[in-house]
Design a protein with these regions (language model features):
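Short glycine/proline-enriched loop/turn "hinge" motifs that connect secondary-structure elements
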Residues: 513-520, 591-595, 746-753
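Soluble metallo-hydrolase cores and metallopeptidase-like ectodomains found primarily
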Residues: 458-527
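Short active-site segment of divalent metal-dependent hydrolases/proteases
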Residues: 533
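Generic recognition of flexible, low-complexity loop/linker segments
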Residues: 487-490, 512-515, 555, 618-621, ...
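C-terminal accessory segments enriched in acidic
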Residues: 1-461, 618-628, 640-828
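Short, conserved catalytic or adaptor-binding loops enriched in Gly and charged residues
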Residues: 475-481, 557-558, 592-595, 748-751
């Protein structure tokens, strides 16, 4: 917990020691200060500075206190716009200088050429609104000449110049990582003080902002100490296979930094949010580099690395006080599980301790060798599993383990272990060369549907608030009491939270149902939500669809043509964290909750049977159980500008997400005649999506406005990085941008899923009316897929055969299904 000086205190010390003390009676004083503080505090500072100058006998010529964050934008709005308000302005032209980019370069990344333009965002909307001008009256141009980074020219309706001015931000360069200085250099805007007395410059130097001081400490002290610790714990080689390196790196911050909303959609000014994102993403980058360095540069960079839980915990603005930084690093209690027993004998007063390391047992995959039925009894009387061992060495240990499980169950513990629905007893048979050991257990499966406090009575899912994982569980299991919904806990997350699955289909009387038949008789729609758990709207519209299909006859009718499987929250650990963080800063993006509790993306662990992220195994199990015809994975992204101050301003690994571009999705095709059914489906889905999403007038108007803003600020200047494809007033990416395309392999021709879709909604973090709006966008997308499946064309083939006195009957549904929309394969 370091003692960090407040930037304003640093200013006062320098000003009073080096400027105020030099002011003689009648001296003319000018001062410009740049600090990273809220506008109200900066105005108070200016008043106080003037007062102290006058008390010293000086004459104030000019005192200006500007923002050290987004310096160009706030110079325009606070210094230029008030002057223009009193003039007959017809047009405003804003010039900006390109940010220098070196090609070729040894740096891992650089700033964007339009970086200085980006720092003006959203100046055109703000200026037009403040001056009462049409939006197209404010224009930008790239300027190569002149010393200043920015220029502004205001003209009247005749073209006469009313105002011309220029401005440059103050900035410095630093390494992206102190520990790896060759990785990249970044340019960071900063604070400054310039003071003149009687035209003599007394001070013209940097005043480090609070965020500068915080970041310097975090890089030079925290990350260096953490790096030393994990090297010590890994024998000097913190390679990827030795991760996770730690349990939690928590960075709690209270600071006097600007954090306020702009009157443009969900845009805001927030140094605090930027610090959250730098702490989170830059730290993950740091550990990627740690692993790569340990591997001699051969480690692939991947989001699958699980360094540990990086947790920025940022409090709301604490105006007018020094920053309070508390950093907590915690490792794991033990490198591997241990059983420690401390005991003493009755006759002995001294305690003794025994420690045993618990190594995992290497158990081969069991096979079913026994399925016993009895006349007049439902289900299986016994279900037997055979474990075949190569030698006898592990047999006693496994037998003891099974005996201990029996003893625990006799005491009422772990009663659901080895519980399988539809079987009365479970038999476990261990076979080794020359030895056999068998145990029998009562099968006590967990209830598939949790008992809610009350049955479903009225609408549960509303779109006026963020749904927490706990609320999602209540909703899911309450809906599970209805006839056509089966809700069960598919597994548990790394931190022990339930991951529930909802299966929605027409009611069935039988307790045992063939999964093969469910996959065959009707198409399957599979939907997952909150993979990136701070993208909050997906759970809301997914659960609402589930509720309607469970309770509304109109929506229930769709179940005649499809089965639906839903995972409302596949990343409950991240969702729980982001839910708690939004209580502090409700509209921040809260990316610390994006990935899992250990850092990697959950789906990246689906095919890793040894993963620590057990929530990924639920996704794996559901995808194996339900062979989906359509898969949907709705996502989200920031609802406002996304800034990384210490990574050259724009989000380093997510450049195209810098500002909102409205709701969007993709329906891509590969020009290959062998993939006609898949391409036809994508073309049909494009129409269904446009119809369902943009039929809401407010959704359509909002998206078109933000699409236009995105084009003005990004595509015009850097089309290689930013693009949009608008189809029927909806952003749906369809065309290839690359000049080449990979040739699809054989697996592309046999995949059963005809359409896999993802979306991006402006929902990090949406609240209130904005959450309702973006959730309506997502619900329209779900309904597009429901309509597609409802109208799809598919066939069922019944085949019968007789052989050696037995009759075989099979039912087959060829895949992929085909679009039922006439002419879908001929759309342009």
């Amino acid at each position: 917990k370091p003692e960090l000086e407040w930037e304003v205190d640093a200013f006062w010390k320098k000003f009073r020691e080096e400027v105020l003390s030099e002011i003689a009676s009648g001296a003319k004083v000018s001062m410009e200060l740049r600090v990273s503080e809220a506008p109200e505090l900066r105005r108070e500072l200016a008043i106080q500075v003037k007062s102290e100058i006058e008390a010293q006998g000086g004459q104030v010529e000019e005192v200006t206190v500007l923002s050290a964050y987004k310096q160009g934008l706030l110079w325009l709005m606070e210094q230029v716009a008030p002057v223009l308000e009193n003039l007959p302005v017809a047009t405003v032209e804003l010039g900006w200088k390109p940010f220098p980019v070196e090609i070729p370069t040894d740096q891992r990344f650089q700033g964007e050429p339009a970086r200085w333009l980006n720092e003006l965002y959203p100046a055109d909307d703000l200026l037009a609104g403040q001056l009462g001008l049409p939006l197209n009256s404010v224009s930008f141009f790239m300027q190569e000449e002149g010393e200043s980074i920015y220029s502004v020219t205001a003209k009247d309706s005749s073209g006469a110049v009313l105002l011309q001015d220029s401005f440059s931000p103050k900035y410095y360069e630093r390494p992206y990582f102190d520990a790896f200085p060759d990785y990249a250099q970044v340019t960071v805007t900063t604070g400054w003080l310039k003071a003149t007395v009687d035209e003599v410059t007394l001070v013209d130097e940097r005043i480090a902002t609070d965020s500068d001081r915080i970041w310097d400490y975090y890089q030079a002290t925290t990350l260096e100490e953490v790096y030393d610790e994990i090297k010590s714990n890994t024998g000097g080689k913190p390679t990827r296979d030795k991760a996770p390196y730690f349990h939690t790196l928590r960075v709690e911050l209270k600071a006097s930094e600007p954090d306020y909303k702009l009157e443009i959609d969900q845009e805001h000014i927030s140094v605090l949010e930027s610090l959250h994102d730098d702490i989170y993403f830059d730290t993950l980058d740091f550990f990627y580099e740690v692993a790569e360095t340990a591997a001699g540069g051969d480690a692939p960079r991947s989001r699958s690395l699980a360094p540990g839980n990086v947790l920025p915990w940022i409090h709301p603005e604490r105006r007018g006080q020094p920053p309070e930084l508390t950093i907590t690093y915690s490792g794991f209690a033990s490198k591997q599980p241990k059983l420690v027993v401390r005991y003493r004998e009755k006759e002995n007063e001294e305690y003794e301790t025994e420690t045993r390391v618990l190594a995992p047992a290497e158990i081969p995959e069991p096979y079913i060798y026994l399925a016993e039925v009895k006349a007049g009894e439902d289900g299986l009387a016994r279900l037997g599993f055979l474990v075949t061992l190569e030698d006898t060495e592990p047999l006693p240990r496994l037998a003891t383990l099974l005996d201990n499980l029996q003893r625990l169950q006799d005491e009422g513990l772990f009663t659901e272990a080895l519980g399988i629905r539809g079987a009365a007893q479970i038999v476990v048979r261990l076979e080794a060369p020359g030895a056999v050991s068998t145990r029998t257990y009562a099968s006590q499966p967990a209830e598939r549907s949790a008992a809610p406090s009350e049955l479903y009575r009225s609408r549960l899912v509303t779109w006026d608030h963020v749904i927490s994982p706990a609320e999602s569980e209540i909703i899911s299991h309450t809906l599970g009491t209805l006839p056509n919904v089966t809700t069960y806990v598919g597994g548990y997350s790394y931190q022990g939270r339930p991951v529930s699955v909802m299966e929605i289909k027409l009611p069935m009387e039988a307790e045992l149902v063939s999964q093969a038949k469910l996959n065959t008789w009707k198409p399957v729609l599979s939907i997952v939500g909150r993979q990136h758990a701070n993208e909050v709207s997906s759970t809301s519209h997914i659960l609402r669809l589930a509720e309607l299909m469970a309770t509304d006859p109109q929506y229930q009718s769709y179940l005649k043509r499809m089965n639906v499987v839903i995972q409302p929250v596949v990343n409950p650990d991240g969702a729980s964290l982001s839910y708690e963080l939004q209580k502090l800063t409700p509209t921040h993006c809260l990316h610390a909750g994006r990935y899992s509790a250990l850092g990697p993306d959950v789906p990246g662990q689906v095919n890793n049977p040894d993963t620590l992220l057990t929530e990924a195994l639920v996704m794996r199990d559901v995808s194996r159980k339900w062979v989906a015809d359509v898969r949907l994975n709705p996502h989200g992204y920031p609802s406002h500008e996304w800034v990384h101050q210490f990574a050259n301003y724009n989000p380093k690994s997510f450049r195209s997400y810098w500002i909102p571009r409205g709701w969007y999705t993709s329906a891509r095709v590969i020009e290959d005649p062998r993939l006609k059914d898949y391409n036809d489906a994508a073309l049909a889905m494009r129409d269904y999506i446009a119809e369902e999403v943009s039929k809401d007038p407010q959704v359509r108007e909002t998206n078109l406005r933000i699409y236009d803003r995105y084009q003005r600020w990004t595509m015009r200047w850097q089309p290689h990085l930013y693009n949009l494809e608008i189809y029927r007033d909806t952003a749906i990416y369809h065309s290839r941008r690359s000049s080449s395309v990979s040739v699809p392999g054989p697996e592309a021709l046999i995949r059963p899923t005809v359409f896999s879709g993802s979306t991006e909604a402006m929902d990090e973090t949406a609240q209130g009316p904005w959450l309702d709006l973006v959730t309506r966008m997502g619900f329209g997308y779900l309904m597009a897929s429901v309509r597609f499946l409802d109208e799809a064309v598919y066939s069922l083939y019944r085949m019968e055969g007789e052989s050696q006195g037995s009759v075989r009957i099979s039912l087959t549904r060829p895949r992929p299904i085909r679009s039922g929309r006439p002419g879908s394969g001929n759309q342009q």
